[in-house]
Amino acid sequence: FLIKMKSLARKSQRLLNSLKIKGNDYTEQTYNFDLDSIIPYYIKDFENANSIVEAKNQFFKYQKEVYELSIPFYIESYNYFKNLDNNFAVSILKTASEKAKDNPKALKTIAYKFEESGDYEKAKIIYKRLLKIRPGDEQTYRDLALIYKENEEYELAASLYNKILKNKISNVNVLGLQETIVNEASHMYWTKADKLILTDFPLKTLKTFVPKNDWKNFGYDFRIVFDWNDPAVEFNIQFVDPKKKYYNWSHTIIDDKEVLEDELNYGYNTEEFIIEKSDKGEWIVNIENYSIE
């Protein structure tokens, strides 16, 4: 289970209103636990190696003898080596992507890691692979449009937004992610309009999704986007505002059964929250995973 967060709304008003409710005061709890107990033993062996060469040799040994098909092994190893030898770390992700070429959940995790490292070109390759194996998923088209933008391939991004917003993708109606995509396409227009002049960016269509006054004043104080790699995963996200009032959003069968079923049926795993007119100060975001993996 992995969540990708990006700070840049659908539930914004509900979030802010619930923060005003009496009784939802946040009390920070601290727990004592042994960090060493959750560190994989092979990472400890890497750390105890006498040199990076020895650590790499241990990686290859574990890969060959135990973890050849283990995606968590590759991800944890990447996290360890990325600050020591980035090229070697990237090669680990490339190997993982080859092992997981037909595993959407694993490929999303690998793509998130490439994005985290700023290697948008390799992330694009992964997202194009996801498009090939999951052509009916809404998420695939949204992710690909975003990565085109990050790679400054504005013509490709514009063309894909045109297909999405004009409902031109065969057997795919992007409804679950519609508001998120509208926000992201709008943001691209307002920040990269000069790059879109000669493209087929769907400006007129996009405007039909946004109230006139909102379009003229497009923007928001703070936007948080959550992407997760497993549509069936259950978790809770808690927002704590500067006044220590909290709001919980639960992604569980008990609390939001219809939404989870919709996500599974139409293939999307993104949620966004827009926060405006908030008190200044530090926000806290806590995430609790209810799924066992």
Residue ranges and their predicted role:
Residues Y80-F81, F114, Y148, Y189:
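Residue at a conserved register position within TPR or TPR-like alpha-solenoid repeats
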Residues F33-D36, V66-Y74, D85, A100-L107, ...:
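Generic helix N-cap/helix-start motif at coil->alpha-helix transitions
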Residues K192, T199-E293:
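Intrinsic-disorder/low-complexity signal
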Residues E76-Y80, T109-I110, L144, A185:
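Structural register within alpha-helical repeat arrays
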Residues K64, S97-E98, K128-K132, L165-K166:
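Conserved structural position within tetratricopeptide repeats
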Residues K132, Y154-V172, S186-W190:
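TPR/TPR-like (Sel1-like) alpha-helical repeat modules
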